[in-house]
Amino acid sequence: DNSRNGTTGADFGNGANDINSEDVESVTVLKGASATALYGSRASNGVVMITTKKAGVEKLSVTYDGSFTASQVLRVMRTQDIFGQGWGSWDRAENGSWGPRLDGTIHEWGSDKLETPMTKPFSYVKHNLRDFYQTGLEQNHTVSLRYGTEAVGIVATYGNLNSTGIMPNDADTYARNTFSLRGYAKVNKFNFDMSMNFVRKDIRRAESMYMELLQHAVDVDMSSMSDYN
């Protein structure tokens, strides 16, 4: 819910993302008067109600669920392979592909302040854009403990999610640790229900850099700049 943020232009995300999917028992959509009656005017457009799992009468059990996912860039823009580095004429800069025709001759490149100039063939580098990105990896682990009788019951769940995106050097990462505890107790004519949730997220966001990548000279291998000094 970002309604409190006014017109700041900031999106603080969706609280539903903080819920471990393994904890979800059901998702219910409330509409109209029923939603407003329960949650007030803020629910005039409806409510998405997420119910987490609750223990029943069952023996003590411990379960584990895990998944691993890999992601890659599907496709990138095709770049021209006729003209090389420069702006109308050849230039030592690393961006701009409006220079002379590529002819395979040896050219200097990089900063003109280098004591020892770097050289490379004035040739088109294949797969330059695609090779900039890395394979994104995500692993998700959940451990749950359940136990219940007619009188008491408990469900405890710990979840760990770690994701590294497709940007190099782990520039875009997401880590989330969740712990949830839900229990109940029946004492005489009284029923007690308790729930607790803890969430910690560490997020590193990176700019897409796609515009900068498109301006990169087609004859300069991006990998050669990884240790550039």
Regions found by a protein language model. Name each.
Residues D1-N2, K189:
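Residue-level detection of beta-strand-connecting loop/turn positions
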Residues S3-A16, G46, K54-D170, S208-M209:
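Residues embedded in well-ordered regular secondary structure
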Residues G9, N20-D23:
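A contiguous binding-surface segment within folded domains or other stable secondary-structure elements
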Residues D23-S26, A43-S71, A151-Y228:
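Transmembrane beta-barrel strand/turn architecture of Gram-negative outer membrane proteins
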Residues V29-K31:
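Charged docking surfaces used in two-component/phosphorelay signaling
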Residues L38, S144, R182:
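Short, surface-exposed charged micro-motifs
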